Every structure is written in C-alpha cells, then in structure tokens.
C-alpha cells in the first residue's frame, strides 16, 4: 500500500549541497515565471492581483513541503479562473474562502481514503472538453481588456455568453492605443520563445510586462493599468476567517466539489508528467492530502484555489530542480518580491495581462487533440467531449463536469450492455478452441445459453429474454465469460429461476466466475438452484443434464 509520507522526508536522506544549489537556482527562476502568471490569473479570477501571489506563496510552500511529488510546483492555475470569478461575483470573497476551505477538506479526505487512483476513472474526453472550454472562456473574458473596450452594464458580467455579447455590442469603443499595447505584448510572447541563446532563459511574460509597462509610462498612453482598476497591497498575507453561514455553505458546496475534483485531476496529471521527466514515482494519495492542506492554507491567508501547475513544474525540472526544496524556494522568493516589487505591479497595462492570458488559454486548449478526438474517437466519446466543452462555455464548469460524468457513465453502460450477450447454443466450426461448442452433444430436452460479458443493470434484462420451452426440462447457463454481476442481474436470475420452477425446468450453471459465485452464495441463489447443479465445466453440466433428463 502506498505510503502517506511526504516526498521531502524521503529525499532529504540523500540530499547534497550540490543539489541544494541547483534547487535554489530553479526555485528563483520558477518564481520569476510565476510572478506575472499569478497576477494575471488573479485578475482573471476576479480578485486583486496580490491574492494570486498570496496563493503561490502559501499553497506553493505547503504543497511542496507535504506533497507526494519531488518536483511539483503549485499555485493559481487557469483551470480555476472562471469558477473562482463566478463564486466571487455571486457570493463574494467570504464565499470563495469557504468554498476553498471545503475543497481542501474534501481533498484531504480523498487522500486518507486513498482515492488517488480513482481519478483515472474520469474519462479523457471530459478533461479535454472542460479544459478546452475553460480556455475559450478565458479568451472571451480577456477581449475587453485586450481591446480597451468601455463596456457599460448595470450588473457585473459573469456568464461567458454575456461577455461575448457585450464585446460585440461595445466594439465601437475600442481603444486603439490599448489594442496596440496588447498586440505588441502578444507578439513578444509568441516570438520570444523562438529567439536563440540566452533569450530562452528569460520568461517571455516578464519581457512583455516590462515592455508594455514602459510603453504606457514613457509614451503617456491612455491605457488602463492594474493600478487604475485595483488597489494593490504589498503587505504580507495574514490569517483572516470568513463569515460563516449555512446558506453560504449550501450555495458554494457544489463549487467546492468542483474545485476539489479539478485540483485532484490537474495536480495528479502534473505529477505524472513530472515523473516521466525525473524518472521518479509520485505518491498520489499524499499529493491529494498536500493539495488539501495547501488550499486550506491559501484560503486562510486570503488566497484563491491552487493546484499543481504543469508548465511551472516542467520549468522547475528543466532548470535543475529535483526536490521539494525548489518549490519552497520558489515560494520564499515570491514573498520577497511581494514586499519589494509589488507596488510596481500597478504600472502593468491591462492589455498586457490580457495578452498573457491569451497565451495561457492557447496553451491550455490543445486544439489538435480536440480535433483529433472529433475525427477518430467513437461517437459516444465525441458526444461527451462536445457536450462538456459546450456546457463549460455556455453555462459553467460545475454543470459541465456533472453532466459530462453522468453522460459518460450512461454511454459507458450502454457500451457494456451492447457487448453483453445471452444467446442460445450455436454450432460453429472453431478448431482452435478446445472448448468449442460444436464439440459438445446436447442432451435431449436441454437448452444451453451462453452468457458473455458483465451482467449489470444495463444488460440484466437480457436474462429475461431467454425463451423457456415447456418441452424442455433443463436450462444450462454457461457463464465462463461473465466477469461480474450486480444486484439487478441477481434479481433477474431469481426471476428466471421462478419462471423455470413454474415450468419444471431445472437450471444448471456452468463455469461460474469468482465474483458471480460470491454474489450467488450471499444471495442464497446457489441453495435454490442446488449446489449439485453448479458445475465447473460445460462437460459436467451437460452430463448433469443428461442424468436429469
């Protein structure tokens, strides 16, 4: 069983000074990368910029300290932006803090209950669908700032479709100076990564922030900056408790579950990616506990939800980080930056922030995979993918995940039902199968039905479609291909037994698997049928039928 022990405690046994130096360098570089991203993601989430830094500092440190991965870097991520903005708009900061606290508790419970491996049962089409949907909502949400639009609205625009409608409605208010800053910032973000040599060591988002801020300040451009719209604080984060009310808890509980699921999916996915880069193996349940503790800490210090960030984790590895020390250094570095440089964040133009978030959205939305799935996946998977994507954009992430999982479950059961068969004996020529049906002689007045596939509630009705001929006195059910049965299937078997009993037909079971045998034993079905009528092999079952006939 996987140990609930932080990776930090394991790696410190063989820690060296050389690795410490590498971890410190990697941590500082990742902090520089995380700074503009944390600010941008905080603004996209509808909160003040320093709250993104608070999150990276508090949650980042705790998750690195307690986490189940050697190199995970945690902080605010784009996946949470839309849901956080919705919570803040509807329930205020107190609602967000309560939702994040509840999500943290849920994550810790998931870890202690060792549910880390259950995340794999969330279909790839759902994660791809909502990730692409989030990317589109972020993109639409940033058009206003990128173009410098002046949107007049009586109420805050929360829904993505309302924001898109407002963009078209107020497109005539485009600020050309803001658009110029946005386009130049976006070009820097795109081109910088292709420049040779030392340029690749400097995060393009940092260059975009410096160039955009310099343009607006030196050219005295009429462009909104962070300082024009938000009051920025460089104060250290302090513990603050929200005003709890039962109504608020009820309102944000669905959001808390969504945050917990998102945090679990994204953090464990990041761990898997990191494992392949450093040839290590993460502890998924310990990682969930750390994610929970990190989110609780972030909420108490005024931050927003956090999870493992794949891009920052990859940057950590590429720059030499190999232990959780790098993640902790990243948080300490951001703390120093908060105190010293945060006032200068007021100079960052909003179009530059929008450009950074455009790139975040583009990197999130792997459209090649999306299109590839639409071309190659089964129809049922395409339905789940497109439905989750559309619901994320049109409604919100909570609805998308709930409906997506429900739809995926229903379609999965439909697929399983389709492969489950209950059919009469067919004589086929199959020389390769020593168990071939064609090699058996069926006794007179005996029916043989082969049951294939799992017998669960979606397919259990096929048992009742067996035609009972009153001229027969034995019904052999060959169950060698039945891997599992559930309560509904067991109920239908009981009904079949009752129908057979009325017509004086004896049921004989052949080759019953371990799980079905256990269920039949517990339900008393074996005693009803008669244990002497439960045979290990089809030959034994046919011989038994011949004796009864």
PLM ranges: what are they?
Residues 1-426:
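Transmembrane helical cores of multi-pass ion-transport proteins
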Residues 26, 186, 190, 461, ...:
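Short, contiguous clusters of charged residues that form electrostatic/catalytic patches at enzyme active sites
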Residues 74, 509-510, 535:
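Active-site-adjacent beta-strand anchor residues
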Residues 363-528, 546-549:
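The feature marks cytosolic C-terminal regulatory regions of anion transporters and related permeases
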Residues 528-544:
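Short acidic-hydrophobic, aromatic-tinged amphipathic segments that line or gate anion-handling sites
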